Amino acid sequence: MNGRSSNSKSDEKLTAPTLYIFPHAGGTAKDYVPFAKEFSGEVKRVAVQYPGQQDGYGLPPLESIPGLAEEIFAIMKPAARIDTPVALFGHSMGGMLAFEVALRFEAAGYRVLALFLSACSAPGHIKYKQLKGYSDNEMLDLVARATGTDPEFFNDEEFRVGVLPTLRAVRAIAGYSCPPENKLSCPIYTFIGSKDWIATREDMEPWRERTTGDFSLREFPGDHFYLNKNLPELVSDIEIGTLQQFDQI
């Protein structure tokens, strides 16, 4: 790529960086194949399949974002090499998980080049965070009132078994928080859609407080899934950011 330095590394050959891709809630690794294919061969891409997703789709079993991140990191760690720099990208809920996993990578001594967050509100700025304290029955009652459904319908055990995991996942996402002292040393680069009401500029700006490194925010035209129509530009930003950090090793 233009502007890459040849004298910032020592003579030994470094392993190409790995970019871990964290899908949105309900998304799968397969959904991000077009995204991954936009990159050049200079960056290895690994799309994360969340543990526990039934038949490879739907929301994973989720009691808390940090809990799922811990499980994901435990799965990733045996295959991750300490001498291979990593970067992480996450969209929406995937951004929360990417941040938590990045914290774990840094704590374990891995070199994290950068964290890329897309349409993901910062901890403490997530919509509907009041849902964190809701019980299962209160969540069901909220759905009944919001949809006009007869509350008696939710007494059906088969229906409850089917819908409650999703509601618990929504509750966990809405209630995600993280101690303010938990920060990364790598840069955080953020991206939003101009018409996204789920994660706004005001919701994402506080991510700058979660790194001791650089921070940037870029706005693309579009809504919460703006990336579908802006893949080449988004991927270019991510690849350039990753390789620039790689060149500084």
Curated annotation (Swiss-Prot):
Listed SUPFAM superfamilies: alpha/beta-Hydrolases
Uppermost EC category: hydrolase
Gene Ontology biological process terms from the UniProt entry: lipid biosynthetic process
One MF term in the entry's GO annotations: fatty acyl-CoA hydrolase activity
Record's catalysed reaction(s): a fatty acyl-CoA + H2O = a fatty acid + CoA + H(+)
Protein keywords: Hydrolase, Lipid biosynthesis, Lipid metabolism, Virulence
Positions of the catalytic residues: S92, D196, H224
Record keyword Protein biosynthesis present: no
Protein purpose: Involved in the synthesis of both phthiocerol dimycocerosates (PDIMs) and phenolic glycolipids (PGLs), which are structurally related lipids non-covalently bound to the outer cell wall layer of M.tuberculosis and are important virulence factors.
PANTHER family: S-ACYL FATTY ACID SYNTHASE THIOESTERASE, MEDIUM CHAIN (PTHR11487:SF0), THIOESTERASE (PTHR11487)
Protein name according to UniProt: Thioesterase TesA
Organism: Mycobacterium marinum (strain ATCC BAA-535 / M)
Highest classification ranks of the organism: Bacteria, Bacillati, Actinomycetota, Actinomycetes, Mycobacteriales
Gene from which the chain derives: tesA
